[in-house]
Amino acid sequence: MHSVLTKDMEANFRWHLDQPILHSLTIKDLFEETVLNQHLARLMSDFGSPTRAHAASMTAKRLGYGAALTIYARIKHEVLINPIDCTFMTVAEESTKTSWLPIYSFPVKTEGVYQNTVDWITKDLYTKSLVPLVELLAREKGISRVVLFENIFTYMKW
């Protein structure tokens, strides 16, 4: 099961397996103000985001892509995922997957208490993870909650 999942995720998505990492950040880390500030500053300095609002928008898109991956893994492979343990990483230049786009990872667990998928999406993914992060990102001047949710939803719908 683990092998099928990892092969599927790596073949079809930007999913991490043994790539040299330059920078990594879990969703849980973004709830810390200093880490979030460093992350937004890094998107501006290293990736050319012109403003913190733009960097917040980029972050929402990355969160949306990660959410889509977790939903896919949950439905297709019945993986138990705590959304805040998901990680997005910038790979090092010597990696075979070097790109400005992050790659993603999350702990693969298939045993434990299984919650109904709709409840998991509603409670764990949306209410406990995405909504509070949008609230934090929306504090940036020049970006609205609507735009941030739209950025997340675009990837989840995809």
Predicted segments, located by residue:
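Hydrophobic, aromatic-lined core segments that form the binding pocket/scaffold
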Residues: 33-158
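Generic N-terminal leader/targeting and pre-domain segments
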Residues: 1-58
